[in-house]
Amino acid sequence: MTSNNLPTVLESIVEGRRGHLEEIRARIAHVDVDALPKSTRSLFDSLNQGRGGARFIMECKSASPSLGMIREHYQPGEIARVYSRYASGISVLCEPDRFGGDYDHLATVAATSHLPVLCKDFIIDPVQVHAARYFGADAILLMLSVLDDEEYAALAAEAARFDLDILTEVIDEEEVARAIKLGAKIFGVNHRNLHDLSIDLDRSRRLSKLIPADAVLVSESGVRDTETVRQLGGHSNAFLVGSQLTSQENVDLAARELVYGPNKVCGLTSPSAAQTARAAGAVYGGLIFEEASPRNVSRETLQKIIAAEPNLRYVAVSRRTSGYKDLLVDGIFAVQIHAPLQDSVEAEKALIAAVREEVGPQVQVWRAISMSSPLGAEVAAAVEGDVDKLILDAHEGGSGEVFDWATVPAAVKAKSLLAGGISPDNAAQALAVGCAGLDINSGVEYPAGAGTWAGAKDAGALLKIFATISTFHY
């Protein structure tokens, strides 16, 4: 393909990479290519062969053309250890000038993770395929906006020598047709316009209609949160996500929230329950401070829980209307006002303002709203801008009952967690309401007949509900 057909940004990157080819040849000149071992980790298989379920290729990168430097202290091995908990494959940028990549990063990740590793590069020459495999790649990226059919076929044949899978990137209908003719099995649809770096999230939907049913469709670029994943999940098998993860200080938290959403497991009473909640996929852990509640925790238990599982964001839940400062210890991320609804919207706003003044700017303030109350929807809409999150619950909370989800105002959904009787049996229906996440409590506890375990968090139920959450799409 002539350079006149290449997008300006892409053309400059590819030409720069072409200038690196001699350096790459010198770097692996000592390598007997014919003796390179074949890959034993299949990206295609790890992505479930396109048979359903949201899968992720999480990317290690320190910079990008659209954002510049995104992670100054870049440790791909540490990032890969995190990704290994959540992803089905790991992509590693190897282009140095615009992405800060290097083959050393590829080798580090390949040696760190059990997952198949994708060499993310602008591959135009067989020596790059050889280098990818030598440094541990199990798959390579080939871009049809860069390669003509003859070039692609030659590089694909070279990849086949080492059992490397190919992520074939396409950006329009013509490239999809070419990819099908060339035998592609993994289609990467890039939402980014390579001319101006803009994003079109509808591109994967349009092109999905043309991609064979037995292929894997990977949506690339612009996948920034779990809501986007759920919007695209009806036609995409997998998602390649990089900048949204490596730009965050806490990569583990960012990956967990991307895969599962901002969900909370409330009523934690033991360190082991907190550890299971986090391992299952929860972002938030609720600690209840009410002596009348069977899930009440003492300050001593609170400290043990936080020490045992520091990777949850803990929310102190209470029915009080004052004294929230007394609940603040190291590790408390938010306070949740679970007091009964006040007599008016003005009184609600005053209560929230008083609590916010009490706890200070470093602690979030959440408000639980009884949606069973005739005023619930009105109050939720009125105070949405005053709080960091709303908890939409039945009655005064803790009842294990479900309210009428149709009463949730559309305007508050993005800032709300849906609560009240949510269990593995109705989690999918709860997610379909479209709130930011779920607040899970009694629906994942052992029943009354479980002996001494009755009322404790059921680890199996937690795993089951988060499995449903991770595969849900609209």
Curated annotation (Swiss-Prot):
Pfam families, per this entry?
A: IGPS, PRAI
Q: In which pathway does it act?
A: Amino-acid biosynthesis; L-tryptophan biosynthesis; L-tryptophan from chorismate: step 3/5; Amino-acid biosynthesis; L-tryptophan biosynthesis; L-tryptophan from chorismate: step 4/5
Positions of region (Indole-3-glycerol phosphate synthase): 1-262
Family statement drawn from the similarity comment of this UniProt entry: In the N-terminal section; belongs to the TrpC family.
**Catalysis performed (reactions):** N-(5-phospho-beta-D-ribosyl)anthranilate = 1-(2-carboxyphenylamino)-1-deoxy-D-ribulose 5-phosphate; 1-(2-carboxyphenylamino)-1-deoxy-D-ribulose 5-phosphate + H(+) = (1S,2R)-1-C-(indol-3-yl)glycerol 3-phosphate + CO2 + H2O
**Gene3D superfamilies attached to this UniProt entry:** Aldolase class I
Which GO terms of the molecular function aspect are on file?
A: indole-3-glycerol-phosphate synthase activity; phosphoribosylanthranilate isomerase activity
Q: Which UniProt keywords apply?
A: Amino-acid biosynthesis, Aromatic amino acid biosynthesis, Decarboxylase, Isomerase, Lyase, Multifunctional enzyme, Tryptophan biosynthesis
EC numbers listed for it are 4.1.1.48, 5.3.1.24
Role, per record: Bifunctional enzyme that catalyzes two sequential steps of tryptophan biosynthetic pathway. The first reaction is catalyzed by the isomerase, coded by the TrpF domain; the second reaction is catalyzed by the synthase, coded by the TrpC domain.
Span list, region N-(5'-phosphoribosyl)anthranilate isomerase: 263-474
Keyword check for Metal-binding, yes or no.
no
What PANTHER family is this protein classified in? INDOLE-3-GLYCEROL-PHOSPHATE SYNTHASE, TRYPTOPHAN BIOSYNTHESIS PROTEIN
Protein name per UniProt: Tryptophan biosynthesis protein TrpCF
Q: Which cysteines are joined by disulfide bonds?
A: none
GO BP annotations, alphabetical order: L-tryptophan biosynthetic process
Q: Does the keyword Secreted apply?
A: no
Q: How does the annotation summarize its subunit structure?
A: Monomer.
